[in-house]
């Protein structure tokens, strides 16, 4: 089985923010970046194409010729919960952040996820694909 993983293009938010599952805008360079991705995918035929439902992924999938890519919640970016769109500096003053910064792999953000939570949901999705009869798939997601 061949799995093509495609990361979304650059987002248009200041550096240093936990944006996770927030549907943030894309940079004005979207078309140039997307054109490079489209060129790399040209000539490939996929048995199935999925996309994270976040616009930064669905827009790229559509640009590359897959406007009907199946939206899959399990491949969303990690959820920072209450910390979505907060700066890392701002988070460092939150008393709950110490436990998270010390063990973000296992400790979830408030009302959000740990890295292990994200890994578990994404791996369940990927295992389903592996167990299918599909030979060549493409997934538009996050990095």
Task: Tell where the protein language model's regions lie, with residue ranges.
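A glycine-biased structural micro-motif
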Residues: 43, 85, 134-135
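Active-site-proximal alpha-helix that buttresses catalytic centers in soluble enzyme cores
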Residues: 6-67
